[in-house]
């Protein structure tokens, strides 16, 4: 059921070293404040911290009590306070309020601020403005790479997407460069580098500068990873906006996977309690279904349950010695498998109930029509109905963005109509969100000259003038009216299928969207790796309106083993989806590669829309 790795598939590097490094550095920073201390942790850092150093480890290093950084007075009576925070101005104001309250009360304590993953000058300026810069000591916890799975690393920076792609804030690019530098220091240099997007290019150049400054560190080392590919999220918004239909993607869309784990509620656990479950390759049941199209999952779990029951039933014919062996060697594993199986069956049932209620099939049909460019009027009517029924502000916004990007912007009449209906249905407070979406290129209005009618009239005039040679040019400009359509055609993103697409035995990456669409980001990666360059993709790059780069260091490549040259690190700047991860895992199996994923954060369509929204849920 799961994609078995080919026998010749290369081994993955051991990324547990990154956890150990992060843990050791944090312990070192905590011990710089000897004695008992209270630790204030920002909410965003709680889940990543739990994966690195749990409460018992913190207690071993004299952390007395833990507090969440929030907008209310702290009740700590400890003489030493340590703050573990992101470099945000609101956090500096919070720390300043505590320190200044102590000053007013005539109380003297020791304060330490640990910034993660790095400190920014702006934060130090705020501490100075608040008059407490001399009262606190500042440090950095350079924790920027969290291994969520054997092949998935996350920087856990969901704000990267909004900060860079909406605000144009480049401060996190240095963090990305430092993370890449750490990887090349630990796992050897990367002989082949490719990338597309403005942010990717800046991160690459900054990283190369760091490499040149410390050239001695990786010199002479054998590369463990043969290729690195950097890609901006805005190169492919379409994939991120589509509903996910692979199991892991659906679990994320339905329950929200956070930092590699998910909270399953009572409707899944069949009890009155919620349960936090870690989703990774160690969960054997999950690992077999994570990359599968959802339509295959129930059948697999049913068969698994029958097999498990058969193993339990073997006990009946056992003698005492056999029973003893069974209890000591197999029973524990069977019970664990049974528990996991029950959870995933419960999750599937819950997903089915929610999706049936939402009329998921009709939604998928509309998305496929938008991707293929068919029945645009019907799809627009479906979106209008969605808005009128007030189904979900985020869902309606997502569908509007998908319509806009696949059609290279909405015609002015449709843009004004949909926007008016949306604001009337969900409230005028969403007006600023539309401004954000326009700035990010997610929801735009066509200029009058771009409309289909304008191009049609141009063609009509040429036909009347019998200017045969120019008719082809006019039709060509008509075809390129939507860059997505042109790119889709160039890269064959919409597979031509004779009969039913077999989701049980998929033949290409399109299976992650029910056979309707190959993720653009994944197709670009596939094409560049095949060519080992951007050669022959000039037209695609031009249509994407992005800068691309490729660099090969022959001396490093000569040192690399054939196995490491089949290991590819893909860096998503602005987030990647589980659908893209599943698609590239499939490609790896087909081509004999192994992909490793590094993302600023795992994302999905809802997170993308929430990042752009000015109305917080």
Swiss-Prot record:
Signal peptide from the UniProt entry: none
Keyword hit for Phosphoprotein: yes
Chain positions found as N-acetylalanine: 2
Molecular function GO terms recorded: protein-containing complex binding
Record annotation: effect of changing residue 511 to E: Reduces phosphorylation activity, but does not impair phagolysosomal fusion in M.tuberculosis-infected macrophages
SUPFAM superfamilies: Sec1/munc18-like (SM) proteins
Keyword check for Hydrolase: no
Keywords from the named record: Acetylation, Cytoplasmic vesicle, Deafness, Disease variant, Endosome, Ichthyosis, Intrahepatic cholestasis, Lysosome, Membrane, Palmoplantar keratoderma, Phosphoprotein, Protein transport, Transport
Tissue spec. comment: Ubiquitous; highly expressed in testis and low expression in the lung.
InterPro entries named in the record: Sec-1-like_dom1, Sec-1-like_dom3a, Sec1-like, Sec1-like_dom2, Sec1-like_sf, VPS33_dom3b
GO terms classed as biological process: collagen fibril organization; collagen metabolic process; endosome organization; intracellular protein transport; intracellular transport; lysosome localization; megakaryocyte development; melanosome localization
Annotated effect of mutating residue 30 to P: In ARCS1; effect on interaction with VIPAS39 is reported conflictingly but disrupts colocalization with VIPAS39 at cytoplasmic organelle; impairs localization to VIPAS39-containing endosomal compartment; and induces fragmentation of the VIPAS39-containing endosomal compartment; no effect on interaction with STX7 and association with the HOPS complex
One Gene Ontology cellular component: late endosome
Membrane topology of this protein: Peripheral membrane protein
Subunit structure: Interacts with RAB11A and VIPAS39. Interacts with RAB25. Associates with adapter protein complex 3 (AP-3), clathrin:AP-3 and clathrin:HGS complexes. (Microbial infection) Interacts with M.tuberculosis PtpA.
Record's protein name: Vacuolar protein sorting-associated protein 33B
Gene name for this UniProt entry: VPS33B
């Amino acid at each position: 059921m799961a994609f078995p790795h080919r026998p010749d598939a290369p081994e993955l590097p051991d990324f547990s070293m990154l956890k150990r490094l992060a843990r050791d550095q944090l312990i070192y920073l905590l011990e710089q404040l000897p004695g008992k201390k209270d630790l204030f942790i920002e909410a965003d850092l709680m889940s990543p911290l739990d994966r690195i150093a749990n409460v018992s480890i913190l207690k071993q290093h004299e952390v007395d009590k833990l507090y969440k950084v929030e907008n209310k007075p702290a009740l700590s009576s400890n003489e030493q306070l340590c703050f573990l925070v992101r470099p945000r101005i609101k956090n500096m104001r919070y720390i300043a309020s505590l320190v200044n309250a102590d000053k007013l009360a005539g109380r003297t304590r020791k304060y330490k601020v640990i910034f993660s993953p790095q400190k920014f000058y702006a934060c130090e300026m705020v501490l100075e403005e608040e008059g407490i810069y001399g009262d606190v000591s500042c440090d950095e916890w350079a924790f920027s790479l969290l291994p969520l799975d054997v092949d998935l690393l996350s920087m856990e920076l969901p704000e990267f997407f909004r900060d860079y792609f909406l605000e144009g804030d480049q401060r996190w690019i240095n963090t990305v460069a430092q993370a890449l530098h750490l990887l090349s220091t630990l796992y050897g240099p990367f002989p082949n580098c490719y990338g597309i997007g403005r942010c990717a290019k800046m991160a690459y150049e900054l990283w190369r500068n760091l490499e040149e400054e410390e050239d001695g560190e990786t010199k002479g080392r054998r590369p463990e990873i043969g290729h690195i590919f950097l890609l901006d999220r805005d190169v492919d918004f379409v994939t991120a906006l589509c509903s996910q239909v692979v199991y892991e993607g659906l679990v994320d869309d339905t329950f929200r996977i956070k930092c590699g784990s998910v909270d399953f509620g009572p409707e899944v656990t069949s009890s009155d309690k919620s349960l936090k479950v870690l989703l990774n390759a160690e969960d054997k049941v999950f690992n077999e279904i994570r990359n599968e199209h959802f339509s295959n999952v129930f059948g697999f779990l049913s068969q698994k349950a029958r097999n498990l029951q058969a193993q339990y039933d073997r006990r009946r014919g056992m003698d005492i010695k056999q029973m003893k062996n069974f209890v000591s060697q197999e029973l524990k594993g069977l019970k664990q498998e049974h528990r996991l199986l029950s959870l995933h069956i419960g999750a599937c049932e819950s997903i089915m109930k929610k999706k049936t209620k939402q009329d998921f099939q009709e939604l998928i049909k509309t998305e496929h029509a938008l991707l293929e460019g068919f029945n645009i009027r019907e799809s627009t009517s479906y979106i209008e109905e969605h808005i009128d029924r007030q189904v979900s502000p985020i869902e309606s916004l997502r569908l509007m963005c998908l319509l806009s990007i696949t059609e290279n912007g909405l015609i002015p009449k449709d843009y004004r109509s949909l926007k008016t209906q949306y604001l009337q249905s969900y409230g005028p407070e969403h007006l600023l969100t539309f401004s954000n979406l326009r700035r990010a290129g997610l929801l735009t209005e066509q200029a009058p000259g771009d409309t289909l009618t304008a191009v049609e009239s141009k063609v009509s005039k040429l036909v009347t003038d019998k200017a045969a040679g120019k008719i082809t040019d006019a039709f060509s400009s008509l075809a390129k009216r939507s860059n997505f359509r042109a790119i889709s055609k160039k890269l064959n993103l919409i597979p031509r299928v004779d009969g039913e697409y077999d989701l049980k035995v998929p033949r290409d990456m399109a299976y992650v969207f029910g056979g309707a669409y190959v993720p653009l980001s994944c197709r670009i990666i596939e094409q560049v790796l095949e060519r080992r360059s951007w050669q022959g993709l000039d037209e695609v790059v031009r249509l994407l309106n992005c800068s691309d780069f490729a660099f090969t260091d022959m001396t490093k490549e000569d040192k690399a083993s054939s196995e490491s040259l089949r290991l590819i690190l893909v860096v998503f700047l602005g987030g990647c989806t589980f659908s893209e991860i599943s698609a590239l895992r499939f490609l790896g199996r087909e081509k004999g590669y192994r992909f490793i994923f590094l993302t600023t954060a795992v994302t999905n369509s809802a997170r993308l829309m929430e990042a752009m929204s000015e109305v917080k849920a």
